[in-house]
Each structure stands twice: as structure tokens, then as C-alpha cells.
Amino acid sequence: MSITHVKAPTSRLHFGYARCDITPPVGIYHRMWGAARHDQATGVHRALQADIVIAEPLGGDASQRMVRVQLDFVLLDNDQTLRLVTPVAASANVAPDQVIVTHSHSHSAGFFPANRYTMPGGDLIAPFLAEVNAKVAAAAAEAVATLADATVTYATTQCDMAANRDYWDDEKQIYTTGFNPGQAAENTAVVGRVTADDGSLRLLLVNYACHPTTLAWDNTLLSPDFVGALREVVEHEQNAPCCFYQAPCGDLGPKDGFVGDTAVADRNGKQVGHAALSALYSMGPPQTDFAYTGPVVSGATIGTWGWSAHDQARQAETIAFAGGSTDIPLDLIEIPTIASLEQDLERFTVEQTAADAKGDAVAARDFGARAERCRRWLGRVALLPQGKTFELNFSVHQFGDAVWVTCSAEPYSWLGSELRRRFPDLILFISPISGNAQVAYLLPRDRYGQGLYQEEPSALAPGCLEALTDAISAKISATTGHQAKD
């Protein structure tokens, strides 16, 4: 049977938005890379941003209010997140569990774990984060003040800026983390256009999977990485703010990355920005679908299509509003002991000092990187619970034809592609790195035991990614009534 009606995915809801600048001070602790030889930021490439989105059912209902805070940080630990969520919840007049914090994950935004406070520039971290908490809370109040009925229209496109980064070095017989041209990558970009009821453009949303690791150990500037130029391209063309949401990217990074040149980060961002614009140009007016309007006899008999306003039944579909957050218990691996990690840290630090004294820059860099891995594990161990399981948080919210998903940690892109395979009729806006940073990556079961970097810092056992995917899938089905495809 011929298809005569193509839905333009739509959410009709009560919507608020605000943003603020959260650029750290120059001199703050910055070294995210084990191979870096600097500790402190020496300048600013582009400003860092916090975006606050508030969603309620159409017409408004504060009891169902969802507050989403998006930060241009690599991550915050659970205590830092709680210190942010508490004032934001108060400003937005919601319970803390109605506030969801996600991160763009830029590796050049500064690095703020508690065990960095005593390092060069670490003294600036606590006062800076206190300032961020106040700024974001004030922005949350601004977002509440902007709440009004709105329409979000979605479209998907593809962008090849990101690539698989699990590269097998045949000569050295090891996996490295870098561009892997032999493996196809998840390249879906989801774009949302938020319009007011008077037709004015309020906000553009971009959801795309790529580690913001264009800039690496040679970069000493504070930067949102490719996200800054992405926003600039979209905002310049559309004359409206743009909010970027990271998507599952544990195995994805820029094809052209791990450099110190900020021009490369800007070029990567422009590539994603123009892909987002291509999706925006494919959209029709708000609250319309694309419908067949019949034949017209011309030199050929033309099949004509046009944008058709939503009827009452279609409007009812687009105002669906439901969901929330939940936890899933996942198995932990055998966690390294603090004593063994401290012993390794001391040994690598001594070896780094000796290599520096000999003028062996490469060896010093390598020993410094190994010492950094120990510091990160010590930070994780301090935050992991006693016992053999970890309660990992995720959220599922249905907004009309779209489902917004968040989850903790850093899952491989398989999470996104598999959920889209199971729910082809839904728009999925999927964002990881929502707390619980201490558990690090979630790899597919068959990727463990191969020597991949992502396994080294990960606290969760094989099978956890699949368990999380099944839990999210079940929650989507329960929330929306859509059954997952086998």
C-alpha cells in the first residue's frame, strides 16, 4: 500500500530555557591528559557554557517539571553534582531528583576531581565551582520565568566528523585509541527546533556522538572543543541559541583529533554545525506532517506532496508527557586496592622524575601518564561503594514523538544505535555522562579482554552495557507503549 503520510516528529510541551557562561579562570588546574606536561590553563580558546532546559506538559504542570542542566565540562563527581543540583532544584522549585545534569565532555575544559585541589591551579577549583553553582541556579530561575507552550520539531541527519577510535596497531600488536578507518561509526545527528506558539524561533538542539578530544596534551587553553564552533555556526545562521547534547561515544572520537591546534577543533565543530543546519532546512512549519496531496497532470503526471497541519488525533500524540529516573544494579569488577595503586603511583612518579633528570622527554611523558592513571583510579575507588554491585542511574522521558534518554558513565555508541534499531518509530535524544563518572566506560561484552584502553579505567563488568540497554528499552516501552523490535 502506498505511503501517503510521513510524520514530522514533534513534541508539544511547556518549555523554558536559559544559559550562562561557566568559563573557568585562567590558571585553573587543566591537565586532563596523561601525556600533557602542563598543569594549568594558560588562556581561553572559546567560552564554556551551561544550558538549562525545563520541560512540563503542555499548559504547564510544575509537579511534572523536568530540569535539564547541560555543562561544557568533562564531568563532575557525585559530590560536586549534588552541590550543583541542590541550589538548582531550589531555584526551579523542584525536588533534586527532578534535576538531571549532563556534560558535553570536553577534555580541555579543566579537570576538577577533589584529588586535584592540591595540585597547581587546584586552589581555584572549589571557588570556581561555587560560582558555577550560583550562576546555574540563577539561570534555572530565568528558565522558569521563560516557561511557555512550545513546539519541538525534530529531524535526523548524518555527520562523518566522528569515527571509531579503537585502532589496531598491526606492527606493535596493540590497540591504540585513534582513528580506525576499518570500522564504520555511528554517525546519527538528531536536531530539534524549538518554536514559540507565535512562530518565533526559541532554541536549536543538537544531539551527536563524538568525544570532544580534538584538543589533547599539546593544548593549554580552556575550550569546549568542537562544540564551540558548532554552536557558533548554527547560531549565526539561525539567529537563535544552540544547545549541544553529547550522545553515547565511548568508542567514537574526531577523525582529525588529538592535536594542539584550536583551528582543527573549530573545523570539526563547523562540520557538525553544517550537518545540523542541513537537518533544520529539511523541516516544514511547526505542527505539520508531510502528506501526499494527489496527482497533477503535466508533461508527466506529478505526485504532489505538501505540509499538512496536525489534526486532533495527531495533536494528541504530540502532547504525550511521561517518564522519570531510575537505577539499575550492575556488577562491578574486582576493584584495585588503594595500597597497590598508591605503590604504583609512587613508583611511576619516581621514574618520571628520573627520566626528566636524564632529559628523556618521551619516557618522562609515558611514566607521567601511568602515574595519572593511578591517580584517576584512586579517585574512583574513593567513590565506589562496598560490595559487588553498583546502582547506575538513567532516565527516560517521553515528549510526544520523542524520547529523551540520559544515563550515567560513558557507554559505547552501540547503546544509541541499538536503541534506535529497537524503536525505529521514535526520535531518541540520548545523552550519557550524567553522573557516576567513577565507573567510566561501558563496553560491549565481546570487546572485553582485547587490550582496549576503555577497559582499563572501567569499574563495571562485561555484560553491563547490554543490561543497561535492556533496562532502558524496557522503560521506553513502559513509558510510551511502543514495543521494542527483536
Regions found by a protein language model. Give the residues of each.
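Non-catalytic substrate/cofactor recognition surfaces at enzyme active-site rims
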Residues: 2-486
